């Protein structure tokens, strides 16, 4: 629903009447096909199917490992808050139970009592987790947003965006 600069600002969902029923296919033909190609290479297709076939196993391990870590952190004296759907109460827990069937995901956020310095020290002391900004890998990943992805913001701006000084985010892998 946004103007496409590569087609002179065309908005595919607002095409004239004779083309309205074709909006999706025109968008697919003009941009998606151009950007991704008509078909996967055989090797890419092989990798895709290998990943798809093992997805349920990997997701189950992500969820189990993240749940174990969240429960451990929830009882740790240096952690003031854990953000994980499986530990929430009230409406949030009900939503998680309704929508996250089979597990609560692989992301765990937590606040360290020592603030920004504790967050940096925690990240620097990790041996198993990779210190990167992305999430959803088979490997365990960790980041301290206050000193990395949000470091250009003032402390007030960080807090307004939901990033507190001691907040650490883990993307729990399948190790």
Please report, for each region that a protein language model flagged, where it lies by residue:
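Active-site C-terminal subdomain of aminotransferase-like
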Residues: 1-107, 111-139
């Amino acid at each position: 629903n946004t103007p496409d600069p590569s087609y002179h600002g065309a908005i595919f969902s607002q095409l004239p009447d004779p083309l309205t029923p074709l909006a999706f296919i025109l968008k697919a033909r003009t941009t998606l096909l151009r950007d991704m190609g008509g078909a996967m290479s055989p090797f890419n297709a092989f990798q895709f199917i290998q990943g798809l076939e093992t997805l349920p196993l990997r997701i189950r391990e992500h969820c189990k490992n993240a749940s174990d870590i969240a429960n451990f952190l929830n009882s740790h004296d240096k952690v003031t808050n854990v953000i994980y759907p499986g530990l929430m109460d009230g409406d949030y827990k009900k939503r998680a139970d309704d929508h996250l069937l089979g597990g609560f995901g692989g992301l765990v956020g937590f606040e360290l009592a020592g603030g920004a310095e504790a967050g940096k020290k925690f990240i620097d002391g990790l041996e198993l987790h990779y210190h990167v900004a992305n999430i959803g890998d088979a490997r365990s990943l960790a980041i301290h947003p206050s000193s990395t992805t949000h470091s250009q913001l003032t402390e007030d701006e960080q807090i307004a965006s939901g990033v507190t000084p001691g907040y650490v985010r883990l993307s729990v892998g399948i190790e």
